Amino acid sequence: MGQNLSTSNPLGFFPEHQLDPAFKANTNNPDWDFNPNKDNWPKANEVGVGAFGPGLTPPHGGLLGWSPQAQGIITTVPANPPPASTNRQSGRKPTPISPPLRDTHPQAMHWNSTTFHQALQDPRVRGLYFPAGGSSSGTAYPVPDTASHISSIFSRTGDPAPNMESITSGFLGPLLVLQAGFFLLTKILTIPQSLDSWWTSLNFLGGAPVCLGQNSQSPTSNHSPTSCPPICPGYRWMCLRRFIIFLFILLLCLIFLLVLLDYQGMLPVCPLIPGSTTTSTGPCKTCTTTAQGTSLYPSCCCTKPSDGNCTCIPIPSSWAFAKFLWEWASVRFSWLSLLAPFVQWFAGLSPTVWLSVIWMMWYWGPNLYNILSPFIPLLPIFFCLWVYI
């Protein structure tokens, strides 16, 4: 049994094939059968002391192999002391004191000398001390040979860092304005087409608008009268309608601007005073009666009678332009004066009439919204002009 060279015994259960660390069976000599420290098989029945008490470990060692500890012999092996530290000289050493400037840069000691300034007249020597783009003055300042104060570390050198928040807001503001302007422009460009659709729908009540030019001498495919191709006879009428619509929008913006300027007091419109023939605008320095209040804008109108003296009256804060237009139109169109009693009567109506008007507006509101919806993009522009002008 012990001569079986083909049977491995890594755990030491068999008497002739025990694991022996001293024999180095695990490293250089893997042959378990030529272990010189083998026990005879009859001694395996004897009771040995063992490492864990009597009878727990056979004399040959069993699982523990052949070792003094397996035979119950406890030997105290002193531990080797730790090696002396070899890192005592490592780490950051103190910075040595810098040598004097006269030893490291002897040429710096001559910067303030006359010979050095004469040598600077040579472009080749000057290029060594003043590179391209540097100072062009003829005075050179040597580096002092003493260390500067520690507070100089925190001192400013050069231009301060730019404020990124202000730069971002400076770019973000114009971009937002540009985006809002482009959005309003795209919406405004749809106003003529929407008004053109509403205009052409008046000719096709109860049906879909169809271009009437498709059955003429130059027939085209079925299309809307608001999108006629250039070869369609209705193309000229479409351009004419849109031109009128553009003029109407321009007139609307002009009226709003005039009302706004008048409301701000920047449009000196003088109402016609009964009994006066001429009016003029200007400062009230030569007037016999001063206007009430002071403002940076023209705030008074001067009437000049025949005697040469002028009388100043305040310009109304609002609706002066409307009053001027009404008076101007009443002088040239006498029939407009007949509307004044009707307007006064309408303004003095009872609340019941006003409620009926409100109910009618509620009933016709959706249709009015469809008519006025193309003008909604103009409202933000009017609001901005009203606030910032």
Swiss-Prot record:
Residue numbers on the Virion surface membrane side: 2-170, 264-337, 388-389
Subcellular location: Virion membrane
Region span, Disordered: 73-99
Protein name (Swiss-Prot/TrEMBL): Large envelope protein
Alphabetic keyword roster: Acetylation, Caveolin-mediated endocytosis of virus by host, Fusion of virus membrane with host endosomal membrane, Fusion of virus membrane with host membrane, Glycoprotein, Host-virus interaction, Lipoprotein, Membrane, Myristate, Transmembrane, Transmembrane helix, Viral attachment to host cell, Viral envelope protein, Viral penetration into host cytoplasm, Virion, Virus endocytosis by host, Virus entry into host cell
Transmembrane segments: 171-191, 243-263, 338-358, 365-387
Function: The large envelope protein exists in two topological conformations, one which is termed 'external' or Le-HBsAg and the other 'internal' or Li-HBsAg. In its external conformation the protein attaches the virus to cell receptors and thereby initiating infection. This interaction determines the species specificity and liver tropism. This attachment induces virion internalization predominantly through caveolin-mediated endocytosis. The large envelope protein also assures fusion between virion membrane and endosomal membrane. The middle envelope protein plays an important role in the budding of the virion. It is involved in the induction of budding in a nucleocapsid independent way. In this process the majority of envelope proteins bud to form subviral lipoprotein particles of 22 nm of diameter that do not contain a nucleocapsid.
Residues covered by region (Pre-S): 2-163
Family: Belongs to the orthohepadnavirus major surface antigen family.
Record has Transferase as a keyword: no
Gene from which this protein is expressed: S
Classification via Pfam families: vMSA (PF00695)
